[in-house]
Amino acid sequence: MDKIFVDEAVTELRTIGDMLRWAVSRFNDANVYYGHGTDNAWDEAIALVFHALHLPEEIGQQVILSNLTSSEKHKIVELIIRRVRERLPVPYLTNKARFAGLEFYVDERVLVPRSPIAEMIANRFGPWLYGKPVNRILDLCTGSGCIAIACAYEFDEAEVDALDISEDALDVAQVNVETLGVMDRVFPMQSDLFSAIPEGPQYDLIVSNPPYVDEEDIGDMPDEYHHEPAIGLASGRDGLDLTKRILANAAQYLTPTGILVVEVGNSMVHLMEQFPEVPFTWVNFENGGDGVFVLTRDQLIEHQSLFAIYRDAQ
């Protein structure tokens, strides 16, 4: 972005509203991609400007007319320039992301939380878990810990094991566990899927948002996604390397009334093509999103022969 253009913004713009308008114009002109917690330029501008000013996004409209100091304008412009030039997702610039009504710390060690599973958590995974005990939950590929922690908030008597192979991701998850006050019920641990936990029926719910982007899609993703850790996105030729292992192993860790919930995004097409006999229930979301399936323990056991070649060695 031209220095003269930036100096002009700092010199001539006066109010918060001016900066919001300028940010929206810059985002639209640069054709940035929205897919990390917002879907439009205005919400991105609000997030960056209010973060720079240490203001809550829910503050009244009257503040829009407030004048800015020179240092405040410089700080805002710097964030907007980074968003445009580097194509950094807003949550990596603010280190904040909201998920299931909670605010999480995030940085480039983890994916930005955005799973539609948040809606299922708010609905307590109904109807599958209605009236059933939920004492222990397993979150595979936990990343920032957002799903695990949100589950702990919704099921306030349950313990949640939050597993990930990435030590970097687990460091972020631990920050969120401590910040959100669930140290006594959410337990991050390093594990290659199920490798770190003893075999046996112990979880009433296994939930996972694993890597699921296939080889074809990974190269076509907008620049913003390339700031996220590749280990959290790519999963082989068809995007299902980890999902197949989860399907092959999950049943032995579920209680008799337990369920498996997995997000596979666009790779749902590959999954249905490869396993047409499996009765996946694909969740319909009111707030947008797709590619999340549910299977019961009994359904997993019934179709274990289809997944046998993907089972981890014991």
UniProtKB/Swiss-Prot annotation:
Q: Name one GO biological process term.
A: methylation
Q: Name one Pfam family in it.
A: MTS
Q: Which domain of life is it from?
A: Bacteria
Recorded catalytic reaction(s): these are: L-glutaminyl-[ribosomal protein uL3] + S-adenosyl-L-methionine = N(5)-methyl-L-glutaminyl-[ribosomal protein uL3] + S-adenosyl-L-homocysteine + H(+)
Any one GO MF term held by the record is: protein-glutamine N-methyltransferase activity
Which UniProt keyword terms apply here?
Methyltransferase, S-adenosyl-L-methionine, Transferase
Which Gene3D superfamilies does the entry mention? DNA helicase RuvA subunit, C-terminal domain, Vaccinia Virus protein VP39
Q: Per the UniProt record, which EC number(s) apply here?
A: 2.1.1.298
Q: Which is a Gene Ontology cellular component entry for this protein?
A: cytosol
Q: What does this protein do?
A: Methylates large ribosomal subunit protein uL3 on a specific glutamine residue.
PANTHER family per the record?
50S RIBOSOMAL PROTEIN L3 GLUTAMINE METHYLTRANSFERASE, RIBOSOMAL PROTEIN UL3 GLUTAMINE METHYLTRANSFERASE
Could you say which protein family the record assigns here? Belongs to the protein N5-glutamine methyltransferase family. PrmB subfamily.
Protein name, UniProt field: Ribosomal protein uL3 glutamine methyltransferase
Species, as recorded? Shewanella oneidensis (strain ATCC 700550 / JCM 31522 / CIP 106686 / LMG 19005 / NCIMB 14063 / MR-1)
Q: What phylogenetic lineage does the species belong to?
A: Bacteria, Pseudomonadati, Pseudomonadota, Gammaproteobacteria, Alteromonadales
